[in-house]
Amino acid sequence: MYVTNNTALAGGAYRKRKKKFQRPKPRKRARKSKKPPKSENTYVQRFWKNPPRNYILKEPTKPISSYARWIPPEIVDVNNITVNIPNTITASRLPKTEFQETEVFKDARDQWYFPIRPSDGEHDTDVKVKKKWSLDTVLQFLQSSPKHIRQLLLTSLFGSLLGLILDTLFGGPWNLTSRLLRLIISVVPGGRILLTALDGLGYFLGNSANPIHLIENPMMQAFGNSIQKQISPRLAEDIIKAADEQIGGGFMRTIASILSAAASAGTHFTMALPAIPIAAVRPFMR
């Protein structure tokens, strides 16, 4: 008996011979025809695997002349064109809702439309006034300007009495500086109003080409009225005493002679004359 894959054993039994398992060797290069195209869309892969069979359209059996015919165009008169507009009123679907407006008083401030201005002194910038004169420049201008211009500016700003005293102080031969003026004002109670007025005068002088026109300026007139309301009755007398102590050189005698001449000429002062000693009321001789 011829056995190929089995082995004969005693007693007539047979035993199968086990074959060694051999793994199939992988191909180094796969066939390109069996590779699907690289595409992320699965529809393209399915289309490649199962291509449609009925994508070829059949030709029509009837000729075109049997169902197609030429229709001539209509001649339209351009000058007689009428447009029919239907007389339909289009209304909104939702009803119009009316809201009751809140009552706004005339003196109320609307915070939504008007910006909130910070408190006085914070973030204030001078945009319109870019050529403000310093205190030294204002003093130099008053000392070098003619007497009638200096008197007009000072009397319109400080009044007749105090303006006349400051005109004598600025126009005299005492070489007044801003440091000396601050020293005189520091002794006088309420003398800070003079620095405020001269500082405001620097604004007006920096914006005007001709200083004589400042007298006709309504803003200058309003500024002078506000300054004169804040001047105390004893300010002129205190300035005369402080200037005589700091400057000397017969300043009080000069003021006394000027005031006596003005009083004899019938000049009306808006304020009372300062109390000057009788010994000082005499003509000042240089």
UniProtKB/Swiss-Prot annotation:
Propeptide: 1-12
Principal subcellular localization: virion
Superkingdom classification of source: Viruses
Disulfide cysteine pairs (residue numbers): none
Biased composition (Basic residues): 14-36
Cell location: Virion
Any one annotated GO CC term: virion component
Record's keyword terms, sorted: Virion
Ranges where the record places region Disordered: 1-41
Record family assignment: Belongs to the atadenoviridae p32K protein family.
UniProt-recorded name of the protein: Structural protein p32K
